[in-house]
Structure formats: structure tokens, C-alpha cells
Amino acid sequence: QGIATGQEQALRLRLEIRDPDLIMLPWEIMQPQAGTQAISLGHQKLLFSRTTSDVDPLSSLRTDHALNILLILGQNEPNSRQGVNHLQLEQEATTLRKLLENSGQITPSGGSGTFVPCQVDTLIQPTPSELISQLESGNYNILFYAGHGVPAPDGGLLFLRPGVTMNGTELAQVLTRCRVTLAVFNACWGAQPVRQGQTSVPRSSLAEVLIHHGVPAVLAMRDAIADQEALSFIEAFARSLAERMPIDQAV
């Protein structure tokens, strides 16, 4: 911490935790003592991320000078018979696409201003084959998924459209094959392991399955997330990426 302070940089803490019940804990909001501010919000800025050494070495990462994003809008409410109509989904997709594309046209904090090209392609409630085909035909470095998800064996389930799901293992295989470097899930429970009785199954969450298959970076939610929170997060996160912030700082 003293070295980071002396260099006027944030202190990065990368947690390697293998107990599935401990991984879920929000370490970022620990307090030095009762009634004090969370350590990640204090004067000395701390940046948290989870990591694991229990993976094969990554192949050389691609070097891109633009954000090439595939935005996927899945099903919001899997138990809803009526659901959201296609027009509403198109309007939501347009809003998200503008947020992401405009994130490149900003002035970085303390900088002279740099334009970062940002191309966003959108899929609305695709089938698994449509999703795979789009990933394979594009040159995407980032995948954004907005929709519903639940913990389940094989890396959880993403609800792509009514009656159609895709598990984390299937998605991991195509993401690694297409060399996607960052996968972001604005979906509930993406970092939550599946439970068998009272026991959490190790390495069973969507985030962990993708990491262990070789996706370099995954951002997923530990709990439920409201629609407005999801929109605000995407906007702030995309702007930070366009400023060339590291992922942990962008979060």
C-alpha cells in the first residue's frame, strides 16, 4: 500500500479464492472497523478482481485499436407469458448501442482527447446457432449480454428467447474459438455457483466456467440487478474502457 501511495497509483488486489461460498462474498465493501467507509471507497483507492492460477496459460492476446462489440439482448422474464414485445427490445437495443458507440467519442480524464472507434452489432433474442454464427463471422473483442440468467450445471443458463437457453460451457467454447477477450453479462447470478442441497459446487458459475475455458476476462453479477442499474453500469463501464482504463478500474 505504501508503494502504491508513493507512486500515486491505485492498489490492485487480485483475489484467488477456490471455496465457492467465499468467492461470492463482496470483499470490496469490507470495513476496517464498524461504522467506517468501505475499503474500496477510502482515500487510498483499492481495485478488486478475482483471478485463478488453476487454468492453462492463455495464448497471445489480440491487439485491437477499436472496440468491436456484439450486443445480445435475451429474454428478460423467463416465467412471463407475455414478456417484452420485439419493438420494445429494438428500442432498448438502440439505446444500448448508442451508449456504447458514443463512449468512444469522449475526452479521457486529464488527457487531450482520443477517439476510440466503437462498432456495435446487435442480436435480439437469437437462437444459439444464430449467436454462434454471428460470433464466428465477426471480429469481436467484447461480448455484452443483457437478459436473464440462472445458476445451473455447466456454467448456468442464459435465456436467449422464450423456450431457448444456452449454457455456459457451450458459450465458452465459441468465445475462446473466436478469441473474444472480454465477456460482460448484465444478467442476474452470472457469478453465482449452482447449489446441490446446502453445498455450492466449485467452478460452476458462468464466470468461472468461461475463465477456465480460456476467456481472458469476464464480468458477471453476483446477485440480481435492476434494469436501470444495468443501463447505468453499461454506460459508465463502456466510457471507462474507451478511456483505456484496465477492466478492474473500469468496474
For every predicted segment, state its role.
Residues 2-3, 53-60, 131, 166-176, ...:
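Short, charged beta->alpha transition segments
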